[in-house]
Amino acid sequence: MKRISLVVVLLMSIQMVAQSKPKVRTITGFVRLGQNTYEKQIADALIVLRMAKSEFETAGYQVQTLRLTTQPLSELVVGMSNEQALAFLARLDQLSVKEGFLPNVGPAMIQDADDPATMHLLELVLSTLPDIQASTIIADEGGIHWKTIHRTSELVKYVAEHSPRSQGTFKFTATAMLKPLSPFFPGSYHTGPGRQFAIGFEGANVVADIFTKDRRNAEAATADLTAALTTHAKVADNIGNKVAQETGWSYAGVDPTPAPLGDVSIAAAIEDFTGAKFGSSGTLTAARIITAAVKAVPVKQIGYSGLMVPVMEDKLMAQRWAESTYNIDSLLAYSAVCGTGLDTIPLPGNVSIEQMDRIYGDVASLATKWNKPLSARLQPIPNKKPGDQTDFQDPYLFNTTIHPLP
Protein backbone atom coordinates (compact mmCIF):
# COMPACT_ATOMS: atom_id res chain seq x y z
CA MET A 1 0.00 0.00 0.00
CA LYS A 2 2.81 2.40 0.88
CA ARG A 3 4.49 1.65 -2.45
CA ILE A 4 1.26 2.39 -4.37
CA SER A 5 0.80 5.65 -2.46
CA LEU A 6 4.36 6.69 -3.24
CA VAL A 7 3.82 5.98 -6.95
CA VAL A 8 0.63 8.06 -6.91
CA VAL A 9 2.42 10.96 -5.22
CA LEU A 10 5.27 10.78 -7.74
CA LEU A 11 2.86 10.72 -10.68
CA MET A 12 0.98 13.69 -9.27
CA SER A 13 4.24 15.59 -8.80
CA ILE A 14 5.29 14.87 -12.37
CA GLN A 15 1.88 16.01 -13.62
CA MET A 16 2.13 19.25 -11.63
CA VAL A 17 5.55 19.97 -13.07
CA ALA A 18 4.24 19.30 -16.59
CA GLN A 19 1.31 21.61 -16.02
CA SER A 20 3.67 24.35 -14.85
CA LYS A 21 5.82 24.22 -17.96
CA PRO A 22 5.10 27.16 -20.28
CA LYS A 23 4.73 26.89 -24.02
CA VAL A 24 7.23 28.53 -26.30
CA ARG A 25 5.08 31.17 -27.99
CA THR A 26 7.65 31.93 -30.67
CA ILE A 27 11.08 31.25 -32.05
CA THR A 28 11.68 34.33 -34.19
CA GLY A 29 14.36 34.65 -36.84
CA PHE A 30 15.64 37.96 -38.18
CA VAL A 31 16.55 38.05 -41.85
CA ARG A 32 17.59 40.59 -44.47
CA LEU A 33 15.96 39.32 -47.63
CA GLY A 34 17.06 39.93 -51.18
CA GLN A 35 14.32 40.43 -53.74
CA ASN A 36 15.73 37.63 -55.90
CA THR A 37 17.12 35.39 -53.16
CA TYR A 38 14.40 35.50 -50.51
CA GLU A 39 13.15 31.93 -51.02
CA LYS A 40 16.58 30.40 -50.42
CA GLN A 41 17.21 32.75 -47.47
CA ILE A 42 13.90 31.81 -45.88
CA ALA A 43 14.60 28.11 -46.39
CA ASP A 44 17.99 28.52 -44.70
CA ALA A 45 16.43 30.46 -41.81
CA LEU A 46 13.77 27.83 -41.26
CA ILE A 47 16.45 25.16 -40.90
CA VAL A 48 17.78 27.11 -37.91
CA LEU A 49 14.36 27.76 -36.37
CA ARG A 50 13.25 24.16 -36.81
CA MET A 51 16.46 22.98 -35.19
CA ALA A 52 15.65 25.14 -32.15
CA LYS A 53 12.06 23.86 -32.19
CA SER A 54 13.30 20.27 -32.14
CA GLU A 55 15.58 21.03 -29.19
CA PHE A 56 12.66 22.50 -27.23
CA GLU A 57 10.44 19.53 -28.02
CA THR A 58 13.15 17.15 -26.87
CA ALA A 59 13.23 19.12 -23.60
CA GLY A 60 9.46 18.68 -23.24
CA TYR A 61 8.25 22.09 -24.42
CA GLN A 62 5.52 22.73 -26.97
CA VAL A 63 6.49 25.31 -29.60
CA GLN A 64 3.53 27.25 -30.96
CA THR A 65 4.99 29.29 -33.83
CA LEU A 66 8.05 29.94 -35.93
CA ARG A 67 8.34 33.54 -37.10
CA LEU A 68 10.50 35.59 -39.44
CA THR A 69 11.05 39.33 -39.23
CA THR A 70 12.56 41.01 -42.29
CA GLN A 71 14.38 44.31 -42.64
CA PRO A 72 12.05 47.37 -42.43
CA LEU A 73 9.41 47.51 -45.16
CA SER A 74 10.89 50.44 -47.09
CA GLU A 75 14.22 48.59 -47.37
CA LEU A 76 12.55 45.30 -48.28
CA VAL A 77 10.74 46.75 -51.32
CA VAL A 78 13.27 49.43 -52.31
CA GLY A 79 13.12 50.24 -56.02
CA MET A 80 9.70 48.65 -56.51
CA SER A 81 6.47 50.33 -57.56
CA ASN A 82 3.45 49.83 -55.30
CA GLU A 83 2.12 47.18 -57.69
CA GLN A 84 5.43 45.32 -57.75
CA ALA A 85 5.77 45.57 -53.97
CA LEU A 86 2.26 44.21 -53.39
CA ALA A 87 2.93 41.30 -55.73
CA PHE A 88 6.24 40.55 -53.99
CA LEU A 89 4.64 40.72 -50.54
CA ALA A 90 1.77 38.51 -51.70
CA ARG A 91 4.34 35.87 -52.68
CA LEU A 92 5.97 36.22 -49.27
CA ASP A 93 2.57 35.86 -47.60
CA GLN A 94 1.79 32.70 -49.61
CA LEU A 95 5.22 31.24 -48.87
CA SER A 96 4.66 31.75 -45.15
CA VAL A 97 1.52 29.61 -45.30
CA LYS A 98 3.24 26.92 -47.34
CA GLU A 99 6.29 26.72 -45.05
CA GLY A 100 4.48 27.27 -41.74
CA PHE A 101 5.92 30.51 -40.41
CA LEU A 102 4.49 33.92 -39.51
CA PRO A 103 5.96 36.88 -41.46
CA ASN A 104 6.66 40.40 -40.23
CA VAL A 105 7.97 43.22 -42.44
CA GLY A 106 8.99 45.48 -39.57
CA PRO A 107 8.18 49.18 -39.16
CA ALA A 108 6.93 51.25 -42.08
CA MET A 109 8.17 54.40 -40.33
CA ILE A 110 11.13 54.41 -37.95
CA GLN A 111 11.72 58.18 -37.79
CA ASP A 112 9.46 61.17 -38.41
CA ALA A 113 11.58 62.07 -41.44
CA ASP A 114 10.84 58.74 -43.16
CA ASP A 115 8.82 58.80 -46.37
CA PRO A 116 5.17 58.29 -45.37
CA ALA A 117 4.48 56.72 -48.78
CA THR A 118 5.51 53.39 -47.28
CA MET A 119 2.55 53.73 -44.94
CA HIS A 120 0.19 53.77 -47.92
CA LEU A 121 1.71 50.52 -49.13
CA LEU A 122 1.29 49.04 -45.65
CA GLU A 123 -2.37 50.09 -45.60
CA LEU A 124 -2.92 47.96 -48.70
CA VAL A 125 -0.87 45.06 -47.33
CA LEU A 126 -2.74 44.90 -44.02
CA SER A 127 -6.10 45.27 -45.76
CA THR A 128 -5.58 42.56 -48.39
CA LEU A 129 -2.95 40.04 -47.29
CA PRO A 130 -3.98 37.67 -44.50
CA ASP A 131 -0.74 36.97 -42.65
CA ILE A 132 1.91 39.68 -42.95
CA GLN A 133 2.35 41.77 -39.80
CA ALA A 134 4.05 45.14 -39.31
CA SER A 135 4.45 48.18 -37.07
CA THR A 136 5.52 51.78 -36.71
CA ILE A 137 7.87 53.33 -34.16
CA ILE A 138 6.23 56.28 -32.40
CA ALA A 139 8.98 57.02 -29.86
CA ASP A 140 12.63 56.23 -29.24
CA GLU A 141 15.59 57.66 -27.33
CA GLY A 142 15.36 60.78 -29.49
CA GLY A 143 11.82 61.55 -28.38
CA ILE A 144 8.24 61.21 -29.59
CA HIS A 145 7.52 60.92 -33.32
CA TRP A 146 4.41 63.08 -33.67
CA LYS A 147 4.20 62.87 -37.47
CA THR A 148 4.45 59.10 -37.29
CA ILE A 149 1.71 59.05 -34.66
CA HIS A 150 -0.66 60.95 -36.94
CA ARG A 151 0.15 58.77 -39.94
CA THR A 152 -0.32 55.69 -37.75
CA SER A 153 -3.81 56.82 -36.76
CA GLU A 154 -4.68 57.35 -40.42
CA LEU A 155 -3.40 53.88 -41.28
CA VAL A 156 -5.35 52.17 -38.51
CA LYS A 157 -8.53 53.98 -39.52
CA TYR A 158 -8.04 52.92 -43.15
CA VAL A 159 -7.28 49.28 -42.34
CA ALA A 160 -10.26 49.05 -39.99
CA GLU A 161 -12.52 50.23 -42.81
CA HIS A 162 -10.99 48.18 -45.63
CA SER A 163 -9.90 44.82 -44.20
CA PRO A 164 -12.28 41.84 -43.86
CA ARG A 165 -14.22 42.19 -40.57
CA SER A 166 -11.71 44.94 -39.63
CA GLN A 167 -9.24 42.25 -38.55
CA GLY A 168 -6.27 43.75 -40.37
CA THR A 169 -5.66 45.97 -37.35
CA PHE A 170 -4.80 42.85 -35.31
CA LYS A 171 -1.62 42.49 -37.39
CA PHE A 172 -0.30 45.97 -36.63
CA THR A 173 1.01 47.84 -33.61
CA ALA A 174 2.78 51.09 -32.77
CA THR A 175 5.82 50.68 -30.52
CA ALA A 176 7.53 53.14 -28.22
CA MET A 177 11.03 52.64 -26.77
CA LEU A 178 11.11 49.02 -27.94
CA LYS A 179 14.58 47.98 -29.01
CA PRO A 180 15.27 45.75 -32.04
CA LEU A 181 15.16 41.95 -31.95
CA SER A 182 12.00 41.46 -29.88
CA PRO A 183 10.58 38.01 -30.66
CA PHE A 184 6.94 39.04 -30.17
CA PHE A 185 4.75 40.24 -33.04
CA PRO A 186 3.56 42.63 -34.38
CA GLY A 187 6.19 44.96 -32.84
CA SER A 188 9.21 42.84 -33.75
CA TYR A 189 11.83 44.50 -35.97
CA HIS A 190 15.52 44.69 -36.75
CA THR A 191 17.81 46.97 -38.75
CA GLY A 192 20.94 44.83 -39.00
CA PRO A 193 22.29 42.13 -41.30
CA GLY A 194 20.01 39.39 -39.96
CA ARG A 195 21.00 35.77 -39.22
CA GLN A 196 19.80 36.19 -35.64
CA PHE A 197 17.02 34.61 -33.60
CA ALA A 198 15.22 35.17 -30.30
CA ILE A 199 12.76 33.26 -28.13
CA GLY A 200 9.51 34.25 -26.41
CA PHE A 201 7.40 32.27 -23.93
CA GLU A 202 3.69 31.87 -23.23
CA GLY A 203 3.97 31.56 -19.47
CA ALA A 204 0.84 32.92 -17.80
CA ASN A 205 0.26 29.43 -16.38
CA VAL A 206 3.58 29.65 -14.53
CA VAL A 207 2.43 32.90 -12.93
CA ALA A 208 -0.89 31.27 -12.01
CA ASP A 209 0.87 28.40 -10.23
CA ILE A 210 2.99 30.78 -8.15
CA PHE A 211 0.24 33.29 -7.41
CA THR A 212 -2.09 30.52 -6.24
CA LYS A 213 0.58 29.22 -3.87
CA ASP A 214 1.77 32.64 -2.66
CA ARG A 215 -1.57 34.44 -2.62
CA ARG A 216 -1.26 37.98 -1.19
CA ASN A 217 2.37 37.40 -0.20
CA ALA A 218 4.26 39.83 -2.43
CA GLU A 219 7.77 38.95 -1.27
CA ALA A 220 7.30 35.20 -1.61
CA ALA A 221 5.54 35.59 -4.96
CA THR A 222 8.35 37.73 -6.38
CA ALA A 223 11.06 35.30 -5.27
CA ASP A 224 9.21 32.16 -6.33
CA LEU A 225 8.15 33.58 -9.68
CA THR A 226 11.70 34.70 -10.41
CA ALA A 227 12.92 31.17 -9.69
CA ALA A 228 10.22 29.54 -11.83
CA LEU A 229 10.75 31.84 -14.80
CA THR A 230 14.51 31.42 -14.49
CA THR A 231 14.21 27.65 -14.80
CA HIS A 232 12.55 27.91 -18.21
CA ALA A 233 14.52 30.90 -19.44
CA LYS A 234 17.78 29.05 -18.79
CA VAL A 235 16.53 26.17 -20.91
CA ALA A 236 15.89 28.69 -23.70
CA ASP A 237 19.30 30.25 -23.17
CA ASN A 238 21.04 26.88 -23.38
CA ILE A 239 19.14 25.90 -26.51
CA GLY A 240 19.74 29.29 -28.09
CA ASN A 241 23.46 29.12 -27.49
CA LYS A 242 23.67 25.53 -28.72
CA VAL A 243 21.81 26.28 -31.96
CA ALA A 244 23.91 29.41 -32.50
CA GLN A 245 27.12 27.42 -32.11
CA GLU A 246 25.95 24.74 -34.55
CA THR A 247 24.56 27.08 -37.23
CA GLY A 248 26.66 30.24 -37.12
CA TRP A 249 23.56 32.33 -36.44
CA SER A 250 23.55 34.74 -33.48
CA TYR A 251 21.29 34.11 -30.50
CA ALA A 252 19.78 37.48 -29.52
CA GLY A 253 18.19 36.37 -26.25
CA VAL A 254 14.91 35.42 -24.61
CA ASP A 255 11.92 37.53 -23.63
CA PRO A 256 10.73 35.94 -20.34
CA THR A 257 7.46 37.93 -20.44
CA PRO A 258 4.74 35.44 -19.37
CA ALA A 259 2.47 36.05 -22.36
CA PRO A 260 -1.16 34.91 -22.07
CA LEU A 261 -3.43 33.40 -24.71
CA GLY A 262 -7.03 32.29 -24.37
CA ASP A 263 -7.54 30.24 -21.21
CA VAL A 264 -3.85 30.60 -20.33
CA SER A 265 -4.85 33.85 -18.67
CA ILE A 266 -2.72 36.46 -16.96
CA ALA A 267 -5.93 38.05 -15.66
CA ALA A 268 -6.85 34.78 -13.94
CA ALA A 269 -3.36 34.54 -12.45
CA ILE A 270 -3.60 38.08 -11.06
CA GLU A 271 -7.06 37.35 -9.63
CA ASP A 272 -5.60 34.26 -7.92
CA PHE A 273 -3.13 36.55 -6.17
CA THR A 274 -5.41 39.46 -5.26
CA GLY A 275 -8.60 37.54 -4.56
CA ALA A 276 -10.49 40.19 -6.55
CA LYS A 277 -11.46 40.83 -10.16
CA PHE A 278 -8.82 42.08 -12.56
CA GLY A 279 -8.88 45.87 -12.39
CA SER A 280 -9.64 45.98 -8.67
CA SER A 281 -7.23 47.42 -6.13
CA GLY A 282 -4.17 45.19 -5.99
CA THR A 283 -3.98 44.63 -9.74
CA LEU A 284 -1.19 47.17 -10.10
CA THR A 285 0.73 45.51 -7.27
CA ALA A 286 0.44 42.14 -8.99
CA ALA A 287 1.64 43.72 -12.23
CA ARG A 288 4.67 45.13 -10.42
CA ILE A 289 5.47 41.72 -8.91
CA ILE A 290 5.38 40.02 -12.30
CA THR A 291 7.58 42.67 -13.88
CA ALA A 292 10.07 42.61 -11.01
CA ALA A 293 10.33 38.84 -11.29
CA VAL A 294 10.81 38.95 -15.06
CA LYS A 295 13.50 41.63 -14.82
CA ALA A 296 15.37 39.56 -12.22
CA VAL A 297 15.69 36.48 -14.44
CA PRO A 298 19.49 36.12 -14.96
CA VAL A 299 19.63 35.38 -18.69
CA LYS A 300 20.26 37.34 -21.87
CA GLN A 301 16.98 39.28 -22.08
CA ILE A 302 15.47 40.91 -25.14
CA GLY A 303 12.20 42.61 -26.07
CA TYR A 304 9.54 43.77 -23.61
CA SER A 305 10.68 41.68 -20.63
CA GLY A 306 7.71 42.68 -18.52
CA LEU A 307 3.98 42.00 -18.58
CA MET A 308 1.51 41.76 -21.46
CA VAL A 309 -2.16 42.56 -20.93
CA PRO A 310 -3.87 41.99 -24.31
CA VAL A 311 -7.54 42.77 -23.82
CA MET A 312 -8.95 40.45 -26.48
CA GLU A 313 -6.29 37.70 -26.54
CA ASP A 314 -6.83 36.77 -22.89
CA LYS A 315 -10.27 35.16 -22.42
CA LEU A 316 -10.88 36.37 -18.86
CA MET A 317 -9.45 39.79 -19.62
CA ALA A 318 -11.98 40.17 -22.43
CA GLN A 319 -14.73 39.24 -19.99
CA ARG A 320 -13.55 41.76 -17.39
CA TRP A 321 -13.34 44.46 -20.09
CA ALA A 322 -16.99 43.73 -20.89
CA GLU A 323 -17.75 44.12 -17.17
CA SER A 324 -15.86 47.46 -17.13
CA THR A 325 -13.65 46.45 -14.22
CA TYR A 326 -10.80 48.26 -16.02
CA ASN A 327 -10.32 50.60 -18.98
CA ILE A 328 -7.71 52.41 -21.08
CA ASP A 329 -6.71 54.64 -18.18
CA SER A 330 -6.25 51.57 -15.94
CA LEU A 331 -3.94 49.98 -18.50
CA LEU A 332 -1.90 53.16 -18.77
CA ALA A 333 -1.58 53.20 -14.97
CA TYR A 334 -0.37 49.59 -14.96
CA SER A 335 2.09 50.54 -17.69
CA ALA A 336 3.87 52.77 -15.17
CA VAL A 337 5.14 49.65 -13.40
CA CYS A 338 5.26 47.09 -16.22
CA GLY A 339 5.53 46.69 -19.99
CA THR A 340 1.84 46.74 -20.74
CA GLY A 341 0.84 49.46 -23.12
CA LEU A 342 -2.50 49.13 -24.88
CA ASP A 343 -2.93 45.81 -26.66
CA THR A 344 -5.92 44.68 -28.73
CA ILE A 345 -8.12 47.56 -27.61
CA PRO A 346 -11.54 47.60 -29.31
CA LEU A 347 -12.67 51.10 -30.24
CA PRO A 348 -15.97 52.46 -31.59
CA GLY A 349 -16.11 52.85 -35.34
CA ASN A 350 -16.57 56.61 -35.19
CA VAL A 351 -13.32 57.17 -33.29
CA SER A 352 -11.57 60.10 -34.92
CA ILE A 353 -7.99 60.23 -36.10
CA GLU A 354 -7.39 63.01 -33.58
CA GLN A 355 -8.67 60.82 -30.72
CA MET A 356 -6.32 58.03 -31.73
CA ASP A 357 -3.48 60.57 -32.00
CA ARG A 358 -4.06 61.40 -28.34
CA ILE A 359 -4.11 57.75 -27.28
CA TYR A 360 -0.88 56.98 -29.13
CA GLY A 361 0.60 60.17 -27.70
CA ASP A 362 -0.20 59.06 -24.15
CA VAL A 363 1.53 55.72 -24.70
CA ALA A 364 4.57 57.41 -26.25
CA SER A 365 4.72 59.96 -23.43
CA LEU A 366 4.64 57.27 -20.77
CA ALA A 367 7.27 55.19 -22.55
CA THR A 368 9.70 58.08 -22.96
CA LYS A 369 9.14 59.40 -19.43
CA TRP A 370 10.03 56.06 -17.83
CA ASN A 371 12.30 54.70 -20.58
CA LYS A 372 10.29 51.51 -20.97
CA PRO A 373 9.07 49.58 -24.03
CA LEU A 374 5.33 49.96 -24.61
CA SER A 375 3.07 49.37 -27.57
CA ALA A 376 -0.43 50.27 -28.73
CA ARG A 377 -2.56 47.95 -30.86
CA LEU A 378 -5.83 49.81 -31.39
CA GLN A 379 -8.74 48.15 -33.20
CA PRO A 380 -11.58 50.44 -34.32
CA ILE A 381 -14.65 48.61 -35.60
CA PRO A 382 -16.79 50.41 -38.20
CA ASN A 383 -20.50 50.70 -37.45
CA LYS A 384 -19.97 49.70 -33.84
CA LYS A 385 -20.71 52.06 -30.96
CA PRO A 386 -20.07 51.98 -27.19
CA GLY A 387 -22.02 49.15 -25.60
CA ASP A 388 -21.96 47.02 -28.75
CA GLN A 389 -20.28 43.64 -28.85
CA THR A 390 -17.31 43.03 -31.12
CA ASP A 391 -17.79 40.25 -33.67
CA PHE A 392 -14.28 39.26 -34.72
CA GLN A 393 -13.99 35.81 -36.25
CA ASP A 394 -10.45 35.01 -35.21
CA PRO A 395 -9.42 32.05 -33.02
CA TYR A 396 -6.99 34.31 -31.14
CA LEU A 397 -9.45 37.10 -30.35
CA PHE A 398 -12.21 36.90 -27.74
CA ASN A 399 -15.12 39.21 -28.36
CA THR A 400 -16.00 41.81 -25.78
CA THR A 401 -17.91 45.05 -25.27
CA ILE A 402 -16.79 48.36 -26.75
CA HIS A 403 -16.16 51.11 -24.20
CA PRO A 404 -16.97 54.77 -24.71
CA LEU A 405 -13.88 56.91 -25.19
CA PRO A 406 -13.11 59.29 -22.31
Model-derived regions: residue spans:
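Sec-dependent N-terminal signal peptides
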Residues: 4-13
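Sec/Tat signal peptide C-region and signal peptidase I cleavage site
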Residues: 14-18
